[in-house]
Amino acid sequence: MMLPLPTPRALLIAAGALVVAGLLGAGGWYWHTVAARHAMAAYADAMTRAQPALGPQATAETRAAGIRELEAALTQYPSGPGAAEVAYQLGNLRYEAQQYAQARGAWELAVAQGAPQTLRVLSLSGVAYAWEAERNYAKAVDAFKVALTGLGPKDFYYEELLLGLGRAQELAGQKADATATYRRALSELTHSRRLEEIRARLAALGA
């Protein structure tokens, strides 16, 4: 069985608390300027209004309303403190709505806005998942490689990204590369709970 693609809900759950904490932290750093206060107020208001869209039972209409709220805040303050967090959450909502190109755009904006390391990794992983969801596996492979740049086995989300790379390589027909990636995972992720999955993928590849 192919290693599973994370669901949109899993992406949201992975960083819900992180986004709120990051937004509040950004406010502490930038609160000394009037423009920053206005930006933070707009972001906080938009995030509050968008909360119903983040729930597991959100309807398409609720999600669309949340997207509008976050986009309006980013349009008004495209580079204020906390913009990366808002853009990341916008990407999640776009992904949930299966608007994959727009989701990538939002996550790329989060990275461009100087997202902190954890949020940056999540945003880059989202770009890869969006390509994968569109079945553009070659692009997904490239995106996973970008997301893995500079990371090691002890870093946040490294395991998910490395296994995502292997999965995308399989789906792209890059059998030799996928085999190498899974072997790398076995050697680097020695305490992973997914070792049997990895071995199963190698066996399926004839390795």
Language-model segment annotations:
Residues 1-20:
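N-terminal positive-inside, membrane-proximal cytosolic segments immediately preceding the first
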Residues 37, 42, 62, 78, ...:
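Structural signature of alpha-solenoid helical repeat junctions
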Residues 74-83, 97, 113-120, 148-157, ...:
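Short solvent-exposed coil/turn linkers within tandem alpha-helical repeat scaffolds
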